[in-house]
């Protein structure tokens, strides 16, 4: 589920969505549609959903949400990746490194630690230790590796328009139109910024 009914930002706090299962069904509708439409990847949220997960862990670390609901119930076969594990919703309440291991255990394929390389290195060591201790399943991590490689393969094969399309006359005209429409006149003075798209 997404941030639709949250009042806190997971960058700085741990949001909780207390909705009933019926209310949550409304928030899950876009995800059902996206999965049915063949979306290739879904990012998890660092939000507590007590109606869906009884163990007081956010969706990113919830096997009930990631594996049981997203994979099994919705049938999602694509890539599941976490939001940054250094966000306060994880870092302050569970710890970035422990959270990374828990996210992989929940069924997340790709864990994002995007600010501090040292935390990424610690997470790699923690994952290796969790594998050795049997906390993480080698089969699950192999499946995640397969999911990552499949996503890369699909993206590599995808037909992309040439970059020259970006600088085509239609795009330049749209850029100029948006440029002019996005300015707000604060004082009635002649337009002085010109047509340079950098302004």
Residue ranges and their predicted role:
Residues 1-139:
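Second-shell residues forming the walls of enzyme active-site clefts
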Residues 72, 94-199:
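Preference for extracellular/luminal or secreted protein segments
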């Amino acid at each position: 589920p997404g941030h639709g009914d949250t009042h806190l930002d997971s960058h700085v706090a741990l949001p909780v969505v207390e909705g009933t299962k019926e209310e949550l069904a409304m928030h899950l509708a876009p995800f059902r549609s996206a999965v049915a439409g063949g979306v290739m990847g879904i990012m998890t949220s660092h939000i507590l959903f007590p109606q869906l997960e009884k163990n007081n862990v956010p969706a990113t670390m919830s096997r009930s949400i990631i594996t049981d609901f997203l994979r099994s119930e919705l049938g999602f076969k694509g890539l599941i990746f976490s939001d940054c594990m250094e966000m306060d919703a994880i870092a302050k309440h569970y710890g970035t490194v422990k959270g990374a291991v828990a996210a992989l255990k929940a069924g997340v394929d790709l864990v994002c630690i995007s600010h501090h390389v040292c935390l990424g290195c610690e997470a790699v060591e923690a994952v290796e230790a969790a594998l050795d201790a049997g906390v993480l399943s080698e089969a699950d991590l192999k499946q995640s590796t397969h999911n990552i490689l499949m996503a890369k393969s699909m993206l590599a094969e995808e037909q992309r328009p040439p970059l020259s399309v970006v600088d085509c006359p239609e795009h330049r005209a749209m850029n100029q139109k948006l440029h002019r429409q996005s300015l707000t006149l604060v004082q009635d003075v002649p337009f002085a910024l010109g047509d340079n798209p950098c302004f």
